[in-house]
């Protein structure tokens, strides 16, 4: 899985990836994001996850998103998901993530 991370503003991170966010890829995806946030000279408080090319999300992927949400919430930050497919959105809704995550 290729994960592209780029700062769009001082405190904003934009993440795009392609493929399946499952057991094989979720840990790598989450680790790359967390490492980028921790290694940044600036405090990253807003993260946008672009799901345009994510074809599937498993419970492992959902766990990574939840951990990222909790990390950002501690810093009064936000996480926003955009271009989420209907299949992925049904997974988010099934576990109640649509109640606290921002979707665009």
Short names for language-model regions:
Residues 1-16:
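Short beta-strand/loop segment at the start of cytosolic alpha/beta domains
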Residues 102-104:
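Short acidic-hydrophobic, aromatic-tinged amphipathic segments that line or gate anion-handling sites
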Residues 21-100:
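Amphipathic alpha-helical interaction surfaces in cytosolic regulatory modules
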